């Protein structure tokens, strides 16, 4: 949101305390004659500006409605993200205030790593769901009002999907008269168990807003599973908001994410190689999981398959590059090693480009490759490892560096972990780490193996991982190989 203030004369501001200005983008000040600043002591300029404090608004309604995903949702139908407050019973739905934080050591490499919650990280995370934060004065926890956070959904235009609701009633002996979802009829269509949303000329004389009724029960808290059928019928480029009204007061929100579909070309490459233990060719897996994970942020994939035979050199002599001690121990590939100073990933890209070149008008290879603008996933049948602090650690796959557009998969990797490594190659870091892991790529960190997010390691505890967060959608949709 922007604000422009135009005056013909002078502007005077006088305050007894501090005066602060905050902006999410730029602050520009112009003067036609003189712009002056005076201070009794000094005027300071510096980087690393503070983030604006979060505003808080009390919800006046006598009911609260949370939007939640459909029953048995596993991320296949749409992307959905909400501030977890432990109200669904799903794995990963623990209080994010208890799960956001950092480790003193990298937890996947050191079981003795200790976790510390971070109120600062949690405060920053709140902004992804809502700013301002809404407060429910009558719903208390530890004698304090609880907070309300809108949920996010990313769903394709004209696709019908189902959503669930979680409802809290202030006083079950004094029930609300009406609980409805109010929405722009040109934005979406909504049907609940009480019927399709309709206009209400008294509430909206222009008849642009429709209202879908929600069941009111004589319970303090209840769940309405698969209560809503939603179809977005409009192109969304900036977030839209659906509001729940309780007797005219706002009682809940659902934010609709950008629904413009983006596309990603992917090439899955079976590598035929010999690292000194015989000729082997990799097998492709994980395509369905990758498609499902990316669909949550409305990225659709076009996946092709190729074979890359690097058994022999151009002169037909045996290619022994991958048996060099700098890249292999004879039974597995060292993902941190090199081939005459070249990383494994650069080496594979070079071989792929040589096998599938683009040609200029003169019929000669022009130096570019057919798959340069594809996400490139290489599959080996060999095992792999890395050396960390003198210890050899087995590796199923790796997508590095983050956002580089290529990943390498090895023997033993699961379908879900192929997609996990591909997400590294596109834009995402792990969901856990140390203080040093926090960056523009990974602004938030969580407790290890405690979320269902695809960038966690919950599978090591036999838990499903299948979801992505709204802030991850932002990262994924900015990948430089995407097309529209």
Each predicted region: which residue ranges?
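Right-handed beta-helix
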Residues: 1-57
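Residues in well-ordered beta-strands of folded domains
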Residues: 14, 30, 245, 267, ...
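A residue-level signal for beta-strand positions that form part of recognition/binding surfaces
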Residues: 26, 263, 374-376, 451-454
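Propeptide-to-catalytic entry region of secreted or membrane-anchored zinc metalloproteases
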Residues: 58-371, 381-387, 392, 477
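The catalytic-center signature of Zn2+-dependent metalloproteases
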Residues: 242, 405-484
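Extracellular/periplasmic catalytic domains that process cell-envelope and extracellular macromolecules
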Residues: 362-373, 394-403, 446-449
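Active-site scaffold of zinc-dependent metalloenzymes
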Residues: 374-413
